[in-house]
Amino acid sequence: MEYRHLGRSGLKVPVLSFGTGTFGGKGEFFSAWGSTDVAEARKLIDICLEAGVNMFDSADIYSAGSAESVLGEAIKGRPRDELLISTKATFRSGKGANDVGSSRHHLVAAVDAALRRLGTDYIDLFQLHGFDASTPVEETLATLDDLVRAGKLRYIGVSNFSGWHLMKSLAVSERHGLARYVAHQAYYSLVGRDYEWELMPLGIDQGVGAVVWSPLGWGRLTGKIRRGQPLPANSRLPVTADMGPPVPDELLYRVVEALEKVGAEVGKTVPQVALNWLLQRPTVSSVVVGARDEAQLRQNLGAVGWNLTPAQVAELDAASVTTRSYPYWHQQGFLERNPNPV
């Protein structure tokens, strides 16, 4: 397994990390992802560790906290210092007026609750799940800085931020000498390349590493969805599609056909090629892969240990290109002084 620095930090993370969205299976939405129990989670974690994948990502809203609880039970008895635990909070976690957001009140409570569920006394990477415009950035970062100094958090990051959200936060950290975000858990895939327009250049400039979520385009790049064919019987898309990233059908089919062609050339599956393409992009520190079962996990792990050729990368780039929104389409006219990162 290859390990990379998480952004500009000294922490090294595996290029593939394991997501626990399938753990617990509470509620219609998360049960459509999976319902992995503790026994099965232990097996999946064993496979991960054998392959060198030692970072496990969760969130307080995954199955209403059950995903963190299952992860905590599944890692019991393992050397804690050999594991990297990543989790998130900010979204609503209860019915109370303060059970949401990035206020001091909510973040302190959310971190303590996560530590209890995970059965640990520190979190390696804690990320805000979204931007809270109702709480001053200074309050949020001062709270996270206190939690880092208290030893409850090792590193901090964000998820699903706009460019200005992240840049303002980094400026506040620098101005006040507060803990700095080193990671941005962002959506990025061959059928969703918007990350490249603003967030990737920011990550390069500011040393913020990407931890990629949904690298297979919300389950669309599994190799099971093809032009002119119905969705697989066990697809989660009928239940979850409205909550995920929009993907035009023609773009999806064009990308899948390119992935199949390249996959045939290198002897790899559609998802393995899609993941390997991501691993060659700037700023990407780790790609979060999930799995309902051992077979899915082993297939995803086959995305490392080899590389697409520059010609194959260019072919996938061409198949996945989309129309840029403003101001990014306008900036294409001044690439002489403002080049694209890829």
Q: What role is predicted for each listed range?
A:
Residues 27, 33, 94-198:
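Glycine/proline-rich, positively charged
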Residues 1-83:
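N-terminal binding-site loop/beta-alpha segment at the start of enzyme catalytic domains
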Residues 45, 68, 72, 111-115, ...:
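Generic structural signal for well-ordered alpha-helices
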Residues 89-91, 162, 188-192, 214-221, ...:
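Glycine-rich beta-alpha junction loops
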Residues 11-16, 52-55, 79-83, 119-124, ...:
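Short, well-ordered coil/turn segments that N-cap beta-strands
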Residues 6, 18, 41, 48, ...:
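Conserved, mostly hydrophobic/aromatic
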Residues 1-2, 205, 229-265, 280-284, ...:
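Terminal-tail/helix-coil boundary detector
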Residues 195-235, 269, 341:
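Aromatic-lined glycan-binding groove of carbohydrate-active enzymes
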